[in-house]
Structure formats: C-alpha cells, structure tokens
C-alpha cells in the first residue's frame, strides 16, 4: 500500500496562505509527494494513483471551472436531447488549465503539457519545494494567521504560493501572482 496523511485547513479564505501552511507541514513530514485536493473538486481515488504513476515533478488533474458555459450546455442539449443531465459537465465543462500554444486537440483522460493549471487537484514532488527553498531562501514570512498547529506567528515559513498587491495600479487594486521560474 501507499502510506498517506491527510491535512485539512478550515476557515482560511486566502488560498495562497493556506497552500503555504500545507506545504510547510508537508516539508516537516517524511513524505515524497504532496497532493492538493480542494473540497469542491470531485475525483476518483484511482486518479491519485494515476498521477503518481506519471512520475512528474508537478502534475495536475483536470477539473471543471466553478462557472458553467451555458452556451455550450444549450448547444449540447439540442444535439443530444437524450443525454443524462448529470453527464453534461463531462461534455461541456471548461477546465482549469491552459494548453501549450499549438495544441490542436486533446482529451482530459490523457496527459498533456500545459502552460498553467489550477492547484485544486495537483501533485507536487518534495524535491520541487526543496529546490525552491534552496534557490530562493529569502522568500519567507511569519504567518499572521495564528491558531493552526505549528503556526503561532513565531516561525518563518516559505512563500511558495505568493501573491502581491500592485500598489502602482491603484485604480484597479487587482492582486497579481508573483511567480518565480526556475529550471532543474
């Protein structure tokens, strides 16, 4: 069998902070892979085994966006009036990833290279976090949201999933992801 540990973080509205907490806890364990599964992502447990078998540094499973593409749903319902309503999302769902430029077609059941993918169903090898810590040792902070085990506001943790506010664009106040690219 495969030894597993489940970690849950409740009442945390900042996704980047929650992911940093969970990554920090993961790095204090002896496990080799970390798997993010958001509460609203449906999956088959065999999907986890399939992701593990791909042996990639970072690999994600496709899952639908939270919004529905009503135009595609209406078109599919017209073309396939006998289709069970519960099957519609499998056919018309828009997924949380962007394929690399030049990709003409794909299926969500086969591995494909992507430019970006949501972290709501993502597996990351330990070595990815360790490499980021090694390459960018200064990107650390003291969590201000105390109350979780190991997070009492005294210790620094790494900001693997960091977000900053663009203070130069005060008209929008949008949050911009701060992404660090590195190669192995």
Feature locations, PLM:
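Conserved catalytic core of nucleotide-sugar-dependent glycosyltransferases
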Residues: 23, 44-164
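Active-site neighborhoods of divalent-metal-dependent phosphate/nucleic-acid chemistry enzymes
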Residues: 162-175
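Short beta-strand-to-loop acidic/aromatic patch adjacent to the donor-nucleotide binding site
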Residues: 29-44
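Short, acidic, metal-binding catalytic loop of nucleotide-sugar glycosyltransferases
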Residues: 1-3
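Acidic donor-binding loop at a coil-to-helix junction in glycosyltransferase catalytic cores
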Residues: 144-148, 173-181
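A short, glycine-/small-residue-rich helix N-cap motif at loop->alpha-helix starts
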Residues: 13-18
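Phosphate-handling catalytic cores of nucleic-acid transaction enzymes
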Residues: 26
């Amino acid at each position: 069998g495969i030894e597993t540990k489940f970690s849950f973080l409740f009442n945390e509205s900042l996704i980047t902070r929650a992911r940093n907490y969970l990554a920090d806890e993961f790095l204090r364990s002896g496990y080799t892979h970390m798997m993010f599964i958001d509460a609203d992502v449906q999956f088959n447990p065999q999907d986890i085994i399939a992701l593990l078998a791909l042996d990639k540094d970072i690999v994600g499973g496709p899952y639908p966006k939270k919004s529905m593409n009503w135009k595609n749903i209406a078109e599919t319902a017209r073309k396939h009036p006998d289709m069970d309503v519960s099957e519609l999302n499998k056919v018309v769902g828009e997924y949380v990833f962007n394929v690399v430029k030049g990709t003409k077609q794909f299926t969500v059941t086969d591995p494909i290279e992507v430019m970006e993918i949501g972290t709501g169903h993502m597996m990351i090898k330990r070595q990815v976090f360790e490499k980021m810590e090694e390459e960018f040792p200064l990107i650390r902070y003291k969590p201000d949201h105390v109350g979780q085990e190991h997070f009492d506001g005294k210790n620094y943790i790494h900001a693997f999933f960091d977000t900053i506010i663009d203070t130069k664009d005060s008209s929008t106040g949008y949050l911009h992801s701060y992404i660090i690219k590195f190669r192995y």
